[in-house]
C-alpha cells in the first residue's frame, strides 16, 4: 500500500494552527515548540507539493489547498477519535468521556440533577456539559462535537433530516408575576388581562419565546400586542426582574421551583390556556454512539416515561 503523504500529528498541527490563528498559539496549545510545528508544516507542504498557508500575513491564513486539507483532515481525526472511543467501549463503561449538550433552560435547571444521578451510578465516566442555544447545540451534535443533547425546542429546519429527535417529556411554561401585583390575588386571569401586563421576555429568536407565541396564537391571543418592558437573554435575569416588580414573564416551571417554594413569585393561571413544550433527546444517527451515550439516554427515559413508553422510545434510540 502506498504510504500516505501526511501523518495524524501533522493533521492535528494543521487543525490547531487554523483554530488558534498563529503558529505560536498552536504550539502552546499542543505543548510543543514553535520551531517543531513549523518544521512539521514545512515537511507536510513538501510532501504534498502545495502551500498550506499564505506567506507574509501576521495571522496564519490557510490557502485554498490548506482549507481543503483541513476539511478532510478534520474528518479523518474525528473518525480516529470515534475508533478510539469504540475500542474503549469494549470495557463496558470503565471510563471515557461523555459530552452532553443542552439548551439554556434545560442545561441550567434540569441537567445538573440528571448528570448527578448518572455520575452516582457511573462515577468512572467523565461528563462534560455544554450549554448554548438550541440552534448551536443542534449543530454541535450534527458535527460530532457533542454526543447527545437535551433541548426544549425544535432543531433547525436544515438539520431535521440529519438528527434523530426523541421526545420524552413535557415542560410547562408558567406565567409568573411579582407577589405584589394585583393579579396575584385573583384566581385564573382572563386572556384580555394579558394585554394589561408589562412583560419581561427572552429575545424573539429564543425557542421558548417561539413556543409561547405559537401556543398563545392558537388560543386567539396576539402576543405582538403585549407591552414588552425589556428583553433579556438570561432566565435568572428575568426571574430577578419579576421579583423586583418590573413585570411579568413566561418561564419554564423547572426554573422556578425554588421561587415558588419560597413564595417570592406568583404563578398565574390563564383561563383555559396551558403552555407546554416537548423536551427531546437529539443524536446524530450517522455517528458512532458510545455505550455512555446509550446508557445516559436510557437513564433519562427511565426517569421520565412509563414502562410502555420506555419500550417504544428505546427502540427509536
Curated annotation (Swiss-Prot):
Gene3D superfamilies: 3.40.190.290, Winged helix-like DNA-binding domain superfamily/Winged helix DNA-binding domain. It comes from the Eukaryota. Keywords: Chloroplast, DNA-binding, Plastid, Transcription, Transcription regulation. GO terms for molecular function: DNA-binding transcription factor activity; transcription cis-regulatory region binding. InterPro entries: LysR_subst-bd, Tscrpt_reg_HTH_LysR, WH-like_DNA-bd_sf, WH_DNA-bd_sf. Residues 23-42 bind DNA. Residues 6-63 form the HTH lysR-type domain. SUPFAM superfamilies: Periplasmic binding protein-like II (SSF53850), Winged helix' DNA-binding domain (SSF46785). One of its GO terms (cellular component) is chloroplast. It is found in: Plastid, Chloroplast. Pfam families: HTH_1, LysR_substrate. The keyword Flavoprotein does not apply. CDD domains: PBP2_CysL_like. Its main location: plastid. The keyword Chloroplast applies. Trans-acting transcriptional regulator of RuBisCO genes (rbcL and rbcS) expression. Belongs to the LysR transcriptional regulatory family. This is Probable RuBisCO transcriptional regulator.
